Amino acid sequence: MKKSLITLALITITGTAIADSNSGHKEMGHNAMGHSTEMTMDHSNGMAMEGMTDVGMPAAGAKPTKVVHVLLSDDMKIRFKKEVQIETNDVVQFVIMNTGKIDHEFSIGSASEQIEHREMMKAMGNHAHDSGNAVTVKPGKAKQLLWHFHGEKNVELACNIPGHAESGMIKKMAL
């Protein structure tokens, strides 16, 4: 009984002390807390997630409304096995097959985002990577990408491995 009373008293005292020490914190500005007002945090991209683009975002875990089979080939073409009309708000499961003998990338974005990604790939050398809006597919292999289309209506699919898009490995779509 005595231990219970001591424990209860300690919890009460500790809780009160913590509450008192935090009570004025909300009212204090950055200056009052000794923080510089010259530096501010940029929260403009606070909601951005990996792979989010001007034309949509990854849709991991979502149920696709359409399935599109994509063929990447060494003749530097991106083809749909069967043509399909993709619309705004569609969730598309892309099944991407590399039918060639060299690596290819499948990237989703706006034309300006693809140019930016292409420049990054050139600067990095032939660095294969997967991200929310792009996958690199080895020869004879397949990968999947689940994508929710929204935003800009002009979409560009591209292989941004150096030299590939420049050789025509781009597919343009209008939603």
Language-model-detected regions and their locations in the chain:
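Gram-negative bacterial Sec-dependent N-terminal signal peptides
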Residues: M1-A19
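Cleaved targeting-peptide boundary
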Residues: A19-G29
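Extracellular/periplasmic metallocenter environments
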Residues: H30, H35, M41-M49, G132-L175
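A eukaryote-biased signal for short, well-structured alpha-helical docking elements
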Residues: D42-T65
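N-terminal edge beta-strand
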Residues: G61-V91
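Beta-strand cores of secreted/periplasmic/IMS beta-sandwich domains, seen most often
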Residues: K82-S107, K143-G151
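Short aromatic-acidic-glycine turn motif
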Residues: S112-A123
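Short beta-strand and strand-turn-strand segments in soluble, beta-rich domains
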Residues: M121-S131
